Amino acid sequence: MYVADVPARLLAVHAHPDDESLTMAGTLAGAALAGAEVTLVTATLGEEGEVIGDELQGLIAARADQLGGYRLTELAAAGAALGVRERVMLGGLGAFRDSGMAGTPSAEHPRAFIRAQRGGPDHDRAARALAREIDRVRPHVLLTYDEDGGYGHPDHVAVHQVVLAALPLAAWPVPRVLAVIRPRTVTQADFAALTTPPGYLAAAADEVGFLAADDSVAVAVPVTAAAARRRAALAAHATQVELLPGEVFALSNRIAQPLPAAEYFRVLAGSPVPVGPDWTVPADVAAGLDLDR
């Protein structure tokens, strides 16, 4: 899959701990299993997150405000489960803070990552920090979010905008940049087939984000070989994710969601992905790239 004189180098750029596991765990773990070098950049510690269960409620921002430090340990465990070679906090540990949801007081914090959105006071600083990581890692493929961040969270939107700003600042020309998406038809079918466990809430696919047109899919990565690693990574984020029987999970909102059988990406920038002779999309995010450069 990633056979070359030089192993494929993947750089995943995310907003909070758990985003890497919720959106592309199978892709990252599968790449690592195949010999790729996977680096994970995370912008914030997820300080404004809610907490599942009663035991650690004292960590939340409204109380001790220590959730970020705890989630850093969860991120370390998840990264180990996925086989991530290196984890990096964008700009250094604590440089940026979780903004919380749009319109909340936490977005006014002087370190809130919403300030890194295009036109914000920290946009250039964040872009330069990411450009340094791009030049250091020299990724063949950079994986991140689409323009709406998947579901509109201001930190996800900021990540997308920072990635686009960092690309021309870096000396290393990233051959391919991919955005994680969920094709509408497949995702709707997955939700329609889901039996909601007792005590949890049902939702339609349109309510959970990342949906895109089916024909925008450039890569479809089956999760089968990395399914156990995905579950281990999600389990590591225990303050945020609850694994339910079967391939089902829930966040603190207790909405049951299916774990997809594949992870999907569209091309955001760089080299297009070659299709197969029968017009099927490849299962390799580095398909068609020269990995020896």
From Swiss-Prot:
Which keywords are on file for this protein?
A: Hydrolase, Metal-binding, Zinc
> What Pfam families does the database record attribute to this sequence?
PIG-L (PF02585)
Against InterPro entries, the record matches this protein to: GlcNAc_PI_deacetylase-related (IPR003737), LmbE-like_dom_sf (IPR024078), Mycothiol_biosynthesis_MshB (IPR017810)
* Gene3D superfamilies registered for this protein in UniProt: LmbE-like (3.40.50.10320)
Residues binding Zn(2+): H16, D19, H156
Q: How is the cofactor bound?
A: Binds 1 zinc ion per subunit.
The superkingdom of the source organism is: Bacteria
The molecular function terms of the Gene Ontology recorded here are: N-acetylglucosaminylinositol deacetylase activity; zinc ion binding
Q: What class of enzyme is it?
A: hydrolase
SUPFAM superfamilies with a match to the protein in the record: LmbE-like (SSF102588)
Q: Which reaction does it catalyse?
A: 1D-myo-inositol 2-acetamido-2-deoxy-alpha-D-glucopyranoside + H2O = 1D-myo-inositol 2-amino-2-deoxy-alpha-D-glucopyranoside + acetate
GO BP annotations, alphabetical order = mycothiol biosynthetic process
**Which EC numbers does the record give?**
3.5.1.103
Q: Which cofactor does it need?
A: Zn(2+)
Described by its record, this protein's role is as follows: Catalyzes the deacetylation of 1D-myo-inositol 2-acetamido-2-deoxy-alpha-D-glucopyranoside (GlcNAc-Ins) in the mycothiol biosynthesis pathway.
Family, according to the entry, reads as follows: Belongs to the MshB deacetylase family.
- Name of the protein in question: 1D-myo-inositol 2-acetamido-2-deoxy-alpha-D-glucopyranoside deacetylase
Its lineage opens with: Bacteria, Bacillati, Actinomycetota, Actinomycetes, Nakamurellales
